[in-house]
Amino acid sequence: MSKVHYHFDHVGSYLRPQALKEAREKFANGEISQEELLKVQDELVKELVHHEVENGLQVVSDGEFGRSWWHLDFLWNLTGFEAYQQEDSYKFHGAKTRTTNVRINGKIAENPNHPFYRDFEYLKSVTPEGITPKVTIPSPSLIINRDHRSDLYADYYDSWTDFLDDLAKA
């Protein structure tokens, strides 16, 4: 009889704690600095990593606590993209969501100051030895021919191939 090997994975996106929601609101209202917001976020990430490890996970995430959307925050912070308000909202389980989206506004490139770098460095710093930290990033397919996100490529690129090459590199 052969032994069945199971493989499990998790995205690592957790519900945002109330303390983080409140800190984000205070930051948005100018009541606290970004540094103060990150202090709250970091403490909650540290607690989450402890919880993940305590519950047997060998691969941990930061809960995506630094994001407002699982995918758009990553794209907004690449060079060559911008956030904008679209007319219609996303539909999720029949409910309307925010209308924020992303579109091209220049040549696409890696942003060396992307906040995901900082967040991942912090995650690594609070991850115990023998445990693997991970981050989830969206694939290029979330740009290509979706929600008109790639419609403006010809404003900045001579060819579709050049656009795809830069997108893949970023």
What does each model-identified segment do?
Residues 1-170:
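Domain-level signal for soluble alpha/beta catalytic cores
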